Amino acid sequence: MIRLFKEKNAFLCTTLSPALPYALFDRSITNATEIEQFNGNVVFEGIIDCAKKAIANDIPVVLGNDVGCPWITQYDFWRELFYIHKYVGVSNAFALYTATARAAEMAGIGAETGTIEPGKSADLIVIAENPLEDLRALRKVEMVVTQGRKNDHPQVKINPVVTAELDQFLVE
């Protein structure tokens, strides 16, 4: 696998969110059978192992989250950063890099966006705490700036059941 990634100059898009519920949730919540939970854990551990091997072999890694899968929300991408930190063991800075500059590079738009610097385009979130210290700070967005317009305290429709279940896995 590593050889093929290097030959093709490919990126690995690590996506832990879809497998986490099937691997780690109580089956009474997911309604998964014992076999489905076993298989979910095989997939989850495989994703973690693949990400670790890619990083150890200098394969570029980015993050995805497969919005549309059960237990995945459009407002929770920050969890994917937390999961790669917690389960793969990367630093908070590396997690942020995979979701910003590295993702822009993979998309072929790294010269235009992905980092905050003169001449580049950027949509920004403003948060009260430093995600380099704790990635969970990303969940409390104070402001969004997009295309030059700011949105103070954006309101997001949150599913409390999904949030409560997923929050159980935010402990380091």
Residue ranges of model-derived segments:
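Extracytoplasmic/secreted cell-surface and envelope-processing proteins
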Residues: M1, W71-Q74, R136
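Active-site core of metal-dependent hydrolases
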Residues: M1-E45, G68, A104-A107, A128
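Structured helix-beta-strand junction loops
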Residues: L4-K8, N57-D58, L138-V141
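Generic beta-sheet signal
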Residues: C13-T15, G64, Q147
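Short, acidic/turn-prone active-site loops that include or flank metal/cofactor-
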Residues: L16-L20, G89, R149-K150
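His/Asp/Glu-enriched, well-ordered alpha-helical/loop segment
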Residues: A32-E36, F44-N130
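C-terminal cap of metal-dependent C-N hydrolases
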Residues: A99-A101, P118-A164
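A short C-terminal boundary segment appended to hydrolase-like catalytic domains
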Residues: A164-E172
